[in-house]
Amino acid sequence: MSEQIVTPESSTPVVPNKETKINLLDLNRQQMREFFKNLGEKPFRADQVMKWMYHYCCDNFDEMTDINKVLRGKLKEVAEIRAPEVVEEQRSSDGTIKWAIAVGDQRVETVYIPEDDRATLCVSSQVGCALECKFCSTAQQGFNRNLRVSEIIGQVWRAAKIVGAAKVTGQRPITNVVMMGMGEPLLNLTNVVPAMEIMLDDFGFGLSKRRVTLSTSGVVPALDKLGDMIDVALAISLHAPNDTIRDEIVPINKKYNIETFLGAVRRYLEKSNANQGRVTIEYVMLDHVNDGTEHAHQLAELLKETPCKINLIPWNPFPGAPYGRSSNSRIDRFSKVLMSYGFTTIVRKTRGDDIDAACGQLAGDVIDRTKRTLRKRMQGEVIDIKAI
């Protein structure tokens, strides 16, 4: 397992340069104001441009009608607004949309999950992942690189552009963002934190801190740093009731065990208002691996000092994986044990699994029909060969 924590020291230049245009999607509001100051402009001009960028999803300076023509001309010489492009779109029968998004010569995946009262966007932070969780499709491709700020916030921008910008449609197209796509967000703090700042900024996407969630598998030093930098909702990928099982399925546990991880979680909760005093526990259900009633009792004892709600996640198969999905009856028994201890327990509804957009299935490449057929067979579903 390769692990390198990138700490938040912005390296993005904010000095205008005609030879190398600055992508304004790489800049948070503080950096935008510095950039405009270096252009000889007042700080409020940065705020105006940000509103056009994020409230209207505008990437054309000429369309920014409250910006004078001279400034628009200067901006075109030294800056651009360039979000990553969608190279393929897949739509699920349940309304979920998965976009394969080009980042340089590679791809990441972003998932849009609409519901009656909300619309959640699942965003990637890295190309691949270094943590090698055994049940996750992303981990099987290894780690390639961190995404830039523009490639992270650009996923939100691109999705909002497609489904309808807030000022264009009159309603918020994305109500929640979860950093639960490809990669471990805490291994890319340099870019993840400024991107989340833009999500929260009133001149950015203006989301409540309770509606931006970062999920981590347990990079403890970075989690301790996060609490001093930004306040967002926290979810943790626990997936096991003891170190023996977690060492096997979440290898970073060998470096930062459950006790150490939960200690860092409690420290974060002490600093955070976004979490309302409790963390979300993510627990993927693997058949006869971590889903027995004895495991549920162990989990309840383990979490008794950590205020939390628990999401039980039916595992989503992918070709070559050594696991099976827990039966509904085993998940139900597990859930009832946890509830008997007083834990708020939710069985997550699987969304987008017919397009490989469900939890643990994002792989970066556009999934081909052969892989999808193999996955369906693993689930015991009958495949109509004519539909493949």
Swiss-Prot record:
CDD domains assigned: Radical_SAM
Catalytic reactions of this protein: adenosine(2503) in 23S rRNA + 2 reduced [2Fe-2S]-[ferredoxin] + 2 S-adenosyl-L-methionine = 2-methyladenosine(2503) in 23S rRNA + 5'-deoxyadenosine + L-methionine + 2 oxidized [2Fe-2S]-[ferredoxin] + S-adenosyl-L-homocysteine; adenosine(37) in tRNA + 2 reduced [2Fe-2S]-[ferredoxin] + 2 S-adenosyl-L-methionine = 2-methyladenosine(37) in tRNA + 5'-deoxyadenosine + L-methionine + 2 oxidized [2Fe-2S]-[ferredoxin] + S-adenosyl-L-homocysteine
Pfam families listed in its UniProt record: Radical_SAM, RlmN_N
* InterPro entries the record matches: Aldolase_TIM, Methyltransferase_A, RlmN_N, RNA_MTrfase_RlmN, rRNA_lsu_MTrfase_RlmN/Cfr, rSAM
CC cofactor note: Binds 1 [4Fe-4S] cluster. The cluster is coordinated with 3 cysteines and an exchangeable S-adenosyl-L-methionine.
- Radical SAM core domain residues are 115-354
Q: What class of enzyme is it?
A: transferase
Q: What are the recorded Gene Ontology BP terms? A: rRNA base methylation; tRNA methylation
Q: Which residues bind [4Fe-4S] cluster?
A: C129, C133, C136
General function of this protein: Specifically methylates position 2 of adenine 2503 in 23S rRNA and position 2 of adenine 37 in tRNAs. m2A2503 modification seems to play a crucial role in the proofreading step occurring at the peptidyl transferase center and thus would serve to optimize ribosomal fidelity.
Q: Which PANTHER family match?
A: 23S RRNA METHYLTRANSFERASE (PTHR30544), RADICAL SAM CORE DOMAIN-CONTAINING PROTEIN (PTHR30544:SF5)
- Name of the protein this chain belongs to: Dual-specificity RNA methyltransferase RlmN
Recorded source organism is Salmonella typhimurium (strain LT2 / SGSC1412 / ATCC 700720)
The record's gene field reads: rlmN
